[in-house]
């Protein structure tokens, strides 16, 4: 830095000797390759340990199923063993890889991403009738005055004495149902014997030792408890619910999914496929730049400037090496 000795006069000293070669930090790595599971589009995911990698991308791949493309997990493990602090991983997959899925009644459940790992996903549904509403007075046909409407919303399915109904409107404590109840639901006792219950259900999503539990889920699309909203942040599955029609019968929501007379049950996803290894080529690893959030392969690292060193483990295809070198430069 320049030193000022008097107005208009200063002296700056600098080293004229050749600079020595400086090492490049390798604490943060970037990896591209095939994995058991994990997203194949979007920004690479951060892994702060090999355990973290296994949770997001699965374990080691078999030589029998993945051949020369099986080395991603091995390389990430060695990276951490040899002092790596963190890495970012972008999973790639053959174009014909398929996500496991299952359509059950009005519900379609799909694994979060491609691969036969999804064939081990179990979905369990359990009918729950916990929340209660006491009706104090009948005002009109299918219109009642409730003691409290807390926990109930317009569009919710309800149950009374084995009969199912749907709340059409709620105004103050006045509740209008879509249909009239066959039995009288009014009860003015302090401790009521007759109550209307919210028809909800619990959902458990299981993949190996990873379990996600969602309590008091409903099929009411306008409710925060809607199954689509509740499972929106699931790391294991994505769900879609068929839109309701006027011809649909009102009934137990679990029966609408699993079938008539089934109020509790479990099903397994199927059809997941890792893809054909013979269809893996240079383009699989180089990837496609479809814009933010949709990039694949090496191109996905355009959304990441934190890595110090990059690798495509086990791949020595000249086009891939050239693309990787160009990206690093």
Regions found by a protein language model. Give the residues of each.
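Surface-exposed assembly/interface segments
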Residues: 1-329
């Amino acid at each position: 830095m320049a030193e000022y000795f008097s107005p208009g006069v200063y002296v700056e000293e600098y080293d004229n000797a050749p600079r020595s070669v400086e090492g490049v930090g390798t604490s943060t790595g970037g990896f591209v390759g095939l994995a058991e599971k994990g997203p194949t589009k979007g920004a690479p995911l951060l892994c702060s340990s090999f355990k973290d990698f296994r949770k997001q991308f699965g374990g080691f791949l078999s030589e029998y199923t993945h051949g020369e493309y099986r080395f991603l997990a091995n390389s990430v493990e060695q990276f951490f063993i040899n002092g790596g602090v963190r890495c970012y991983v972008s999973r790639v997959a053959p174009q014909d890889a398929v996500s496991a899925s299952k359509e059950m009644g009005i519900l379609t459940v799909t694994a979060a991403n491609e691969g036969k790992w999804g064939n081990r996903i179990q979905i369990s549904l359990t009918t729950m009738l916990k929340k209660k509403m006491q009706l104090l007075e009948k005002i009109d046909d299918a219109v009642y005055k409730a003691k409290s409407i807390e926990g109930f919303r317009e569009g919710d399915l309800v149950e009374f004495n084995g009969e199912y109904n749907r709340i059409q409107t709620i105004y103050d404590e006045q509740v209008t149902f879509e249909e009239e109840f066959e039995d009288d639901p009014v009860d003015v006792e302090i401790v009521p014997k007759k109550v209307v219950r919210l028809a909800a259900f619990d959902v458990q999503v299981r993949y190996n030792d990873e379990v996600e539990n969602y309590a008091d889920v409903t099929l009411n699309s306008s409710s925060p408890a809607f199954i689509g909203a509740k499972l929106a942040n699931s790391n294991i599955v994505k769900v879609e619910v068929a839109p309701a029609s006027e011809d649909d019968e009102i009934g137990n929501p679990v029966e609408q999914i699993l079938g008539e007379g089934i109020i509790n049950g479990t099903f397994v996803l199927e059809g997941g496929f890792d893809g054909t290894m013979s269809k893996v080529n240079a383009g699989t690893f180089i990837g496609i730049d479809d814009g933010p959030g949709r990039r694949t392969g090496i191109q996905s690292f355009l959304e990441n400037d934190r890595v110090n060193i990059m690798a495509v483990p086990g791949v020595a295809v000249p086009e891939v090496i050239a693309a990787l070198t160009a990206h690093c430069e």
